[in-house]
């Protein structure tokens, strides 16, 4: 996979070059192409923004440098703009994007984009109901969530499958040594060696976490008979 990023601040993307994603870059499992669209301006001062028509505070990013930067790419793939009005990014989107050969992100800054820039994109995406100074941090979050799903990026291929949201539930609690820390003990089932019981416990605890912390996720989920039984047990245990 090749990911292009149009940004005024390419140095902000250094964190993607460390840890597992960084090793993936070194091993050529994915490619990151940072494009500073200031390089595509035509005036001597390299302006990328201007005052808004109709007046108002702030500066608006111009379409021409961004359009020229996009046109310079040989393989754009899906073009994504990060903006507060976009649909909220989620794990399903990361899974879909991870199947693409090319992705291109456009990072905004200042007051925002000239409205015509949105017509250059296939999707407008947000990471939440809050405003940041630019689109670089949301873009890095989405790249991380997407690239980690590529084959060979994570050491354990089962990891992305078992994590939160992958099956529409939050992740079950996890423990490691010591088995007893100041009286707080690891659930006995996890040390029993009974893989079926462990799987059942994890499923129920994932359901419990989702019910307690993200009940909205259950509203869209078609529960199996076993999950309905587990959920009734969870509700009963909560009441008691």
UniProtKB/Swiss-Prot annotation:
<dbReference type="InterPro" id="IPR016009">
    <property type="entry name" value="tRNA_MeTrfase_TRMD/TRM10"/>
</dbReference>
<comment type="subunit">
    <text>Homodimer.</text>
</comment>
<dbReference type="InterPro" id="IPR029026">
    <property type="entry name" value="tRNA_m1G_MTases_N"/>
</dbReference>
<keyword id="KW-0489">Methyltransferase</keyword>
<dbReference type="InterPro" id="IPR002649">
    <property type="entry name" value="tRNA_m1G_MeTrfase_TrmD"/>
</dbReference>
<dbReference type="Pfam" id="PF01746">
    <property type="entry name" value="tRNA_m1G_MT"/>
</dbReference>
<protein>
    <recommendedName>
        <fullName>tRNA (guanine-N(1)-)-methyltransferase</fullName>
        <ecNumber>2.1.1.228</ecNumber>
    </recommendedName>
</protein>
<dbReference type="GO" id="GO:0005829">
    <property type="term" value="C:cytosol"/>
</dbReference>
<comment type="function">
    <text>Specifically methylates guanosine-37 in various tRNAs.</text>
</comment>
<keyword id="KW-0819">tRNA processing</keyword>
<feature type="binding site">
    <location>
        <position position="108"/>
    </location>
    <ligand>
        <name>S-adenosyl-L-methionine</name>
    </ligand>
</feature>
<keyword id="KW-0808">Transferase</keyword>
<keyword id="KW-0963">Cytoplasm</keyword>
<comment type="similarity">
    <text>Belongs to the RNA methyltransferase TrmD family.</text>
</comment>
<dbReference type="InterPro" id="IPR023148">
    <property type="entry name" value="tRNA_m1G_MeTrfase_C_sf"/>
</dbReference>
<keyword id="KW-0949">S-adenosyl-L-methionine</keyword>
<feature type="binding site">
    <location>
        <begin position="127"/>
        <end position="132"/>
    </location>
    <ligand>
        <name>S-adenosyl-L-methionine</name>
    </ligand>
</feature>
<dbReference type="GO" id="GO:0052906">
    <property type="term" value="F:tRNA (guanine(37)-N1)-methyltransferase activity"/>
</dbReference>
<dbReference type="GO" id="GO:0002939">
    <property type="term" value="P:tRNA N1-guanine methylation"/>
</dbReference>
<dbReference type="InterPro" id="IPR029028">
    <property type="entry name" value="Alpha/beta_knot_MTases"/>
</dbReference>
């Amino acid at each position: 996979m090749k990911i292009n990023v149009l940004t005024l601040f390419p140095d902000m993307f250094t964190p993607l070059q460390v840890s597992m994603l960084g090793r993936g870059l070194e091993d050529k499992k994915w490619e990151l192409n940072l494009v500073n669209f200031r390089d595509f301006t035509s005036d001597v001062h390299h302006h990328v923004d201007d005052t808004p028509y109709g007046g108002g505070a702030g500066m608006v990013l111009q379409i021409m440098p961004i359009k020229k930067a996009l046109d310079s790419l040989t393989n754009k793939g899906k073009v994504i703009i990060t903006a507060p009005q976009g649909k909220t990014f989620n794990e399903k989107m990361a899974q879909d994007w991870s199947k693409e050969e090319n992705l291109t992100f456009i990072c905004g800054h200042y007051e925002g984009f000239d409205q015509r820039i949105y017509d250059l994109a296939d999707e407008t995406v947000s990471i939440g109901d809050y405003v940041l100074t630019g689109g670089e941090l949301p873009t890095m979050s989405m790249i991380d969530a997407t690239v980690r799903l590529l084959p060979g990026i994570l050491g354990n291929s089962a990891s992305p499958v078992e994590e939160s949201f992958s099956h529409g539930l939050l992740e079950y609690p996890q423990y490691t040594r010591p088995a007893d820390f100041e009286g707080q003990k690891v659930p006995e089932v996890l040390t029993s060696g009974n893989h079926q019981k462990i799987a059942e416990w994890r499923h129920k605890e994932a359901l419990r976490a989702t019910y307690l912390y993200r009940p909205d996720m259950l509203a869209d989920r078609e529960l199996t008979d076993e999950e309905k039984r587990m959920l009734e047990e969870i509700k009963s245990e909560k009441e008691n």
